[in-house]
């Protein structure tokens, strides 16, 4: 049974029904249509983590830290709403519009925004550039399907520019595919170095080690 399988996994593993799988994985691959925000449910409201750069919400003026209270005439606060229901109210056909009421700290009244839904490109690496002659900077905002490829491209660019040290910025990164995160860590570690270990509910431990030579094993890394 599903519950029996979960008993052998780690305490953070949950079962995702088939009907919800497309929604859960959508933001981890390709483009999708929406308002362009990353959010989490805080207590009984929707808290915006960030508005995706150049996305519909960012263009409309929505910012990280905002709380979305209403979408059109639908209430989006209260403990009764699940993430799936919230997403259904925020998503819609491309070029359709949604009127949002937003609470912003420091503002005396709710703010009104009209957001035109659009195609949101999913980029995992926001930036890769040199801070000094030796120090390169790379910002990874999630661990999605395309992240490793984007990361490799960024690292190669920085090495070409002379980087011998890397500042890896993971702020506001909500996570994603564990295997992709392992691939990235592997680029910094020598062969057979421990990357991570997982411990299931029965206490069984599984370890993952660095494999082949990484692209940045010799330089310093700051996270």
Language-model region placement:
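Extended, small/polar residue-biased N-terminal targeting/export presequences
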Residues: 2-49, 95-99, 103-127
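Structural motif
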Residues: 65-67
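Cleft-lining beta-strand/loop regions that shape enzyme active-site pockets
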Residues: 47-50, 58, 63, 72-74, ...
């Amino acid at each position: 049974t599903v519950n029996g399988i979960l008993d052998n996994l780690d305490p953070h593993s949950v079962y995702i029904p088939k009907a919800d799988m497309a929604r859960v994985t959508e933001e981890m691959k390709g483009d999708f249509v929406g308002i362009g925000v990353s959010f989490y449910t805080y207590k009984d409201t929707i808290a915006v983590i960030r508005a995706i750069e150049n996305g519909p919400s960012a263009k409309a003026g929505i910012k990280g830290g905002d709380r979305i209270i209403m979408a059109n005439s639908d209430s989006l606060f209260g403990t009764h709403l699940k993430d799936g229901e919230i997403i259904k109210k925020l998503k819609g056909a491309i070029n359709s519009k949604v009127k949002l009421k937003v609470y912003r700290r420091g503002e005396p009244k709710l703010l009104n925004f009209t957001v035109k839904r659009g195609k949101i490109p999913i980029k995992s690496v926001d930036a890769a550039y040199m801070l000094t002659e030796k120090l390169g900077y790379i910002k990874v905002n999630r661990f999605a399907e395309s992240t490793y490829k984007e990361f490799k491209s960024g690292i190669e660019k920085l090495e070409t520019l002379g980087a011998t040290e890397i500042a890896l910025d993971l702020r506001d990164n909500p996570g994603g595919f564990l295997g992709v995160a392992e691939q990235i860590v592997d680029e910094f570690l020598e062969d057979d170095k421990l990357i991570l270990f997982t411990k299931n509910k029965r206490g069984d431990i599984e370890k993952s080690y660095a494999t082949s030579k990484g692209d940045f094993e010799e330089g310093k890394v700051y996270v």
